[in-house]
Amino acid sequence: MFSTTRLTTSAPRAPPHNGAFHPDSAALLLVNTRLPFKIFKTQHFTSEEERLVVTEADTGQRIVRKINGPPAAEEYARVVGAHVGDLNPMRFAATPVVVTIDGTDYVRSIQRANPDGSLTFFCAIDEGLVLRVVRGVDLLGNLERTFDTIRAEIGPFQLVMACDCILRNLEMTQSGAKEAVADLLRNNHVVGFSTYGEQYHGVHVNQTLTGIALGYPREGHDL
């Protein structure tokens, strides 16, 4: 899906840290630039009105046991118009749930339905949380409009570094939109990764594309 970019350097290649991969670790990159840039998040969902209140949860394991009182999988299936036995990754990708914080919807994606009727989530969950089911509308058009809006602010893109949720990839596969989206990303100089969770202004989100768009130097300004 994403383009790849090869960087050429005369510096020696750094080995892995102590020659191994490390769990519970992170790489932090700090960048200072005079280029015009924009940090952004985009998603393509419209929310429904019915509220789903988490009434029992194992927050440490990200498991919701009950929603609105009944078992979580049963209540979720009722709201989306499906049978519990039909709940699978494609269904969860098509109809995730969101929590609203300060008027902004943040997706809380479901990982799987469990044999005991509970639901395991990909991100933090808590009792009392109010969720709403959302449905995807025109992923490709949403992405085009997002790029157009950012371009109007910072000018033509030199590079866009993006993290795109793997569940969006599933949805694109299901809808047949993958090639059209790939063309759009290439045409907008997007490089990046399919990810298992994104972060935007300190909030952990799912099923979004987050990124940093970099423009060209403003007239009269050096890098």
PLM regions: where:
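Hydrophobic alpha/beta core scaffold segments
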Residues: 1-223
